[in-house]
Amino acid sequence: MLTMGWSNILSLFGAMLILAALPSLSVLTVSSKSASGGFIHGLFAALGVVLGDIIFILIALWGLAFLRGAMGDFFVILKYISGIYLSWLGINTIRAKVNNQSLAKVDVKSLSSSFSAGLLITLADQKAVLFYLGFLPTFVDVNNIAYLDIAVIILTAILTVGGVKIFYAFLAHRSGLLISRQNKRIMNYLAGALMISVGVFLLISS
């Protein structure tokens, strides 16, 4: 049974829509992938960001302490793996060739890298868990939350976060058709350096 009222659902939708539109690491990642590799790469990066937000929402609802206790040492190992992989993605982004978007062939492996970049850049921002822990109780009673409430919150995240990031990917793709190869290369360097920095931070903070 749904415990959230329509006013709360609409308020949550509006708040998440505004927050998703703010400039962030995920926006830069999605935009750079789309501008340099085509809209499909921006789309997959956006899907990774959405999955990361869904994971954070579930962690916030179930409790980070419970998750950390249940996973034990694997929680720390997972941070190391994420840090190394994110750094590797950053290096590959810097080294990636800038393609002509109208002629570039879509590579499944590169699409998975774009998805992983979006996911890991989101999961690396561990403050987001604390944000959701303080944010969600404003709209729903987390102590008496129903499964239908969780489904509504996740659907709201998909529509707002996903919609906004995909829109950013579309804009970056359209702009990318007009951006020079040199500027696309600069965008790749910025996004790659960002991923490496976040990956290193995960490693030294584990």
UniProtKB/Swiss-Prot annotation:
It is a multi-pass membrane protein. Belongs to the Rht family. Its main location: membrane. The lineage of its organism: Bacteria, Bacillati, Cyanobacteriota, Cyanophyceae, Synechococcales. GO terms for biological process: amino acid transport. It comes from Synechocystis sp. (strain ATCC 27184 / PCC 6803 / Kazusa). It comes from the Bacteria. Pfam families: LysE. Keywords: Cell membrane, Membrane, Transmembrane, Transmembrane helix. The chain crosses the membrane at residues 9-29, 47-67, 74-94, 150-170. GO terms for molecular function: amino acid transmembrane transporter activity. This is Uncharacterized membrane protein slr1627. The keyword Cytoplasm does not apply. GO terms for cellular component: plasma membrane. It is found in: Cell membrane.
